[in-house]
Amino acid sequence: MANLSGYNFAYLDEQTKRMIRRAILKAVAIPGYQVPFGGREMPMPYGWGTGGIQLTASVIGESDVLKVIDQGADDTTNAVSIRNFFKRVTGVNTTERTDDATVIQTRHRIPETPLTEDQIIIFQVPIPEPLRFIEPRETETRTMHALEEYGVMQVKLYEDIARFGHIATTYAYPVKVNGRYVMDPSPIPKFDNPKMDMMPALQLFGAGREKRIYAVPPFTRVESLDFDDHPFTVQQWDEPCAICGSTHSYLDEVVLDDAGNRMFVCSDTDYCRQQSEAKNQ
């Protein structure tokens, strides 16, 4: 039962949960397609993960174990506030270990630890429309998706190559899902894009401000857009994580002092802790 009296389990009323679950089913049936839903007011402002919170509230059960991360970290403001919110309105167990979680809500990262078929990962999405900055009119972008007119996206990537010699997009890198819809993977770094391809876990995306839900079912093909002569590549670092020594995880740059000294550490705090423990054994 919920710890906070006076509220329904997971805050949302059951009719709203059913409405969101129907939208999820449609999104799973049409991978990458943006499904409108009647978003509700949540006890936090838009831009702080209201879309992801509504998805989590609709799928979480009393036996689930919840993990919430923000930019890969478990201890940042957004992650802590959302985790405490669900602890109060559901009473479910929470964890910082990716392996132990059944539901993972994330802002802007995919965990380094591979996910399994028993897990659901829920992304907080600020702007669900990948064509928004090319064509701002929603009526036009819906038509472009329907007709599969994605040439303008390829032109945008080509303009990067013409200006910089490479595709300069480093986050929210557009992907094609199941060979059909171009999708915004949320502002995850492009380093995480390959993890989405054939992932065993169900991937759900919620945009609270724009009231859109979309999904990538388990074991679905997800391809990052590129060109034959400019294939998709991920970021590389010249040095390992300063804490655990990992050479194959996404690293954050941390400035140490006013002299400009800096170090690189794993963005995923749980993965970094696991690597450190394994190294010390």
Curated annotation (Swiss-Prot):
GO molecular function annotation: 4 iron, 4 sulfur cluster binding; alpha-D-ribose 1-methylphosphonate 5-phosphate C-P-lyase activity; lyase activity; metal ion binding
Positions the record marks as coiled coil are none
Query: Which Cys pairs are S-S linked?
Result: none
Give EC number(s), comma-separated: 4.7.1.1
Q: Which GO terms describe its biological process?
A: organic phosphonate catabolic process; organic phosphonate metabolic process; organic phosphonate transport
Which reactions fall under this protein's catalytic activity?
alpha-D-ribose 1-methylphosphonate 5-phosphate + AH2 + S-adenosyl-L-methionine = alpha-D-ribose 1,2-cyclic phosphate 5-phosphate + methane + 5'-deoxyadenosine + L-methionine + A + H(+)
Identify the enzyme class.
Answer: lyase
Q: What else is known?
A: The sequence shown is that of strain K12.
Q: What protein family is recorded?
A: Belongs to the PhnJ family.
Q: What does this protein do?
A: Catalyzes the breakage of the C-P bond in alpha-D-ribose 1-methylphosphonate 5-phosphate (PRPn) forming alpha-D-ribose 1,2-cyclic phosphate 5-phosphate (PRcP).
Q: How does it assemble?
A: Forms a complex with PhnG, PhnH, PhnI and PhnK with the suggested composition PhnG(4)H(2)I(2)J(2)K.
Q: This protein is called what?
A: Alpha-D-ribose 1-methylphosphonate 5-phosphate C-P lyase
